[in-house]
Amino acid sequence: IVFGDWSSDVCSSDLVSSVNVEKTLEARPIADAGRGLQGTMPGLSVVIPSGEIGSDPIMKIRGQIGSLQGGSSPLILVDNVEIPSIQMLNPDDIESISILKDAASASIYGAKAAFGVILITTKKGAKNQGVTVSYNGNLSFQNISKKMDMAGLDALEYTLAAFERVGGTVAGAFWMVTREGYEKAVEWQEKWGDVVGPDDPMVFGRDWYVDANSRKIGLRTYDPYYYMVKEWTPTQLHNFSVNGKSGNTDYNISLGYLDQTGLIKPSKIDDFKRYNGSIKLGTQVTDWLRVNVGALYSKRNKRYAYATNSTTADPWLYIYRWGPTYPMTTEDGDPTRNPAYEMSVANTAFQMNNYASMNGGLEITPMKNWNINFDYTYS
């Protein structure tokens, strides 16, 4: 690392870690470099805030915590150029990744690097004469990694016991729970729990009944995860590159495409697409002068059900709010206003992000171990 006009070796306390890109990123199908780094490097914390496809990972170095109003994210540099999100970079274009912690990085890169720096270098042109054309693609499948166990009969018993403790005899809303109803729900589970499917219609007398006080008592329990989350979804990745050298000019041209389907079952559309393109050219004009130019383009499209507005709340909140006997349909088979229904009729939201950068630079070597670099980037 160069400090002004002198250089020094980086000690282990300054450089948190270097990534073996071949083993970490290239050996497995990943949607973006951030997710690929999760759990692979000491000192680097990568958290995916939700299971939403296309969501940016939250990255922190050594657990840095900022102020209440300020951020604590590290500075991300790709070929010495800052980018707003690591997700816009095609993992197949990465040649090396290094992590610098706050003290060393702030002295080099300034205040923006107070919480560390992620240094990413992209692939360059070939060192030997010739051209290499390559393609790699894969089809992978994903499922939910952690499923919360939704309470069934035990939730009914807890709710009823809480009401009885304060002198009540009936609990719930829309579909009520009484002591008699709870005992019949236990019988329903023993008799019908393994027989009635989640999509089977409701049957009066079997799944619910009306008591002497004209209250609807629900007996059948539901697992909202079945209605909200798919068992698996596909992801496809395609990468094409041309790498070579002709005379004193070396080059690397690459294209990438990611198509990912989300796990939300009732959504009309739930997908994420990313398009990447990059080019790097370098020419050794003389023994002491090298000219470099490059360009980077990234486009991200995300489509999802927008089911939260002024009259609705987060469907995932209502999954845990409603009791296990709250039905997915009315006794006539019409859908109730439940989380799955809200998402199935919601409008589709479109989120598009475009990023482009162009750069050019000169590398002057007047003598051995003395390199002078001039770089200009427009993004």
What are these regions (language model features)?
Residues G262-R274, Q284, L296, Y304-N309, ...:
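Small-side-chain secondary-structure face that scaffolds active or pore-lining regions
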Residues I144-L153, K265-S267, N292-R321, Y378-S379:
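Outer-membrane beta-barrel and related beta-rich outer-membrane complex signature
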Residues S7-G277, R290-V291:
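Short, small/polar-rich motifs associated with maturation and membrane association
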Residues N136-S140, G256-L258, L296-S298, N359, ...:
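Outer-membrane beta-barrel pore domains and translocons
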Residues K230-T249, G256, Y341-S379:
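Outer-membrane beta-barrel transmembrane strands
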Residues V177, E183, D194-V195, D199, ...:
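Acidic/polar loop-and-plug regions of large Gram-negative outer-membrane beta-barrel proteins
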Residues I1-D5:
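Short, exposed "boundary/linker" segments that immediately precede the start
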